């Protein structure tokens, strides 16, 4: 009971903070302070209550990612809706992690419905995969209903499809791409952490009960997704779409690993958490550019290293973290995956290495395009503001701590009751 309360209470605080935020809707500065306080309170409650995680588990990542994504936003009225939605999604995500029995699947369906509504509401901002994303999340709602009503093994295959939508795996990745490439404000940065965490949580719970045929097909899908995501990222000229496809490639590697070893060890959780947080930082960095100059094509802006030195240093560090270089968390997680005793590599290793080399190409190319080259005389350059700098610096420091911390502290689902991990969201009939 204490384990559930330790998540339900922070979830309730997040939702209450979102609802009460409408009382100060007309004052953006006050509203920003309010949502920051609500996300910080959720994090504090996870630490204070018995049954909460005592170490840097993946559950703790959610309020931290929400807080930092909110902190990096300017106090402008155009960002208010995204702030409120961040708290609502945080509350929904924590509720899903705490839920047992069929309630977990109901909350999953609710989350997917919210994603459909958000993509449709902000369809004018989307530049790619809008209807594919709406259709994919709608398909996820159908799968959640099937998982609630159908017998095994059909229900477990439906749950697996929902996992592949949240933790992106080709060919069910369209919703994730659309969310990161088309939603406003800090929402893409927060969702880059939230959706994969919920997907891995659901997969961890369902893994022992998945049909053998479905589980046997996942390693091949993971390798195909890693290669496909890398090739698509190479072809992108817009930053958010590039980062979304990069994440598809990185998370497909995680799918390959989990399906091969048929468990979710701490190094897999570390890899997911660090990858999501690095993407969070890169998306916040790009938002700082968009807030100044609009949603530009990569070819339209360059040469930021000299006029924006604080941005340049932090952006370069985040690129190195996302590439999996030491001492950042992605490196520790990725090396932990590859060095697992008894892991069959053979031909799969070649695909993983090629996908990682492709990541080195397109991420370093992104770094080179933005930071180096000639200045545009028609642009007024402005370096990071204090809140933007603080948010990005905190992300870099957390990634370093994740890389240096013992891997064992990243136990999957640390604050969740053991019975929930064994029985999943407990779709027992």
Residues of each region from the PLM?
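Alpha-helical transmembrane segments of multi-pass membrane proteins predominantly involved
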Residues: 1-429
């Amino acid at each position: 009971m204490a384990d559930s309360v330790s998540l339900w209470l922070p979830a309730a605080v997040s939702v209450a903070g979102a609802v009460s935020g409408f009382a100060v809707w007309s004052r953006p500065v006050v509203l920003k302070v309010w949502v920051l306080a609500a996300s910080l309170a959720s994090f504090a409650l996870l630490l204070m209550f018995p049954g909460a995680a005592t170490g840097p588990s993946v559950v703790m990542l959610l309020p931290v990612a929400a807080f930092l994504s909110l902190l990096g936003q300017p106090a402008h009225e155009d960002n208010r809706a995204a702030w409120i939605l961040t708290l609502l999604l945080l509350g929904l995500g924590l509720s899903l992690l705490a839920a047992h029995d069929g309630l977990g699947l109901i909350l999953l369906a609710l989350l997917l419905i919210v994603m459909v509504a958000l993509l449709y509401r902000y369809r004018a901002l989307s530049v790619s995969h809008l209807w594919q994303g709406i259709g994919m999340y709608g398909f996820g709602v159908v799968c959640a209903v099937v998982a609630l009503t159908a017998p095994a093994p059909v229900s477990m295959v439906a749950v697996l499809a929902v996992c592949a939508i949240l933790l992106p795996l080709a060919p069910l990745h369209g919703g994730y791409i659309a969310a990161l490439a088309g939603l406003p404000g800090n929402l893409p940065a927060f969702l880059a952490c939230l959706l994969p965490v919920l997907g891995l949580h659901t997969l961890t719970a369902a893994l022992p009960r998945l049909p053998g045929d479905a589980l046997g097909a996942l390693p091949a899908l993971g390798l195909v997704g890693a290669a496909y995501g890398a090739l698509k990222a190479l072809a992108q000229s817009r930053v958010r779409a590039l980062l979304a496809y990069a994440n598809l490639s990185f998370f497909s590697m995680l799918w390959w690993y989990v399906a091969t070893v048929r468990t979710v060890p701490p190094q897999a959780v570390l890899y997911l958490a660090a990858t999501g947080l690095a993407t969070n930082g890169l998306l916040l960095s790009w938002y700082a550019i968009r807030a100044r100059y609009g949603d530009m094509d990569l070819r339209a802006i360059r040469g930021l290293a000299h006029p924006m030195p604080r941005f340049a240093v932090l952006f370069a560090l985040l690129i190195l973290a996302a590439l999996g270089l030491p001492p950042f968390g992605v490196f520790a997680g990725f090396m932990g995956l590859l060095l697992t005793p008894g892991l069959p590599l053979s031909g799969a290793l070649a695909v993983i290495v090629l996908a990682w080399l492709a990541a080195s190409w397109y991420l370093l190319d992104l770094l080179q395009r933005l930071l180096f080259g000639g200045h545009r005389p028609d642009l007024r350059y402005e370096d990071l503001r204090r809140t933007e700098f603080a948010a990005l610096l905190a992300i870099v420091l957390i990634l370093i701590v994740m890389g240096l911390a013992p891997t064992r502290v990243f136990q999957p689902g640390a604050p969740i009751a053991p019975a929930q991990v064994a029985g999943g969201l407990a779709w027992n009939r």
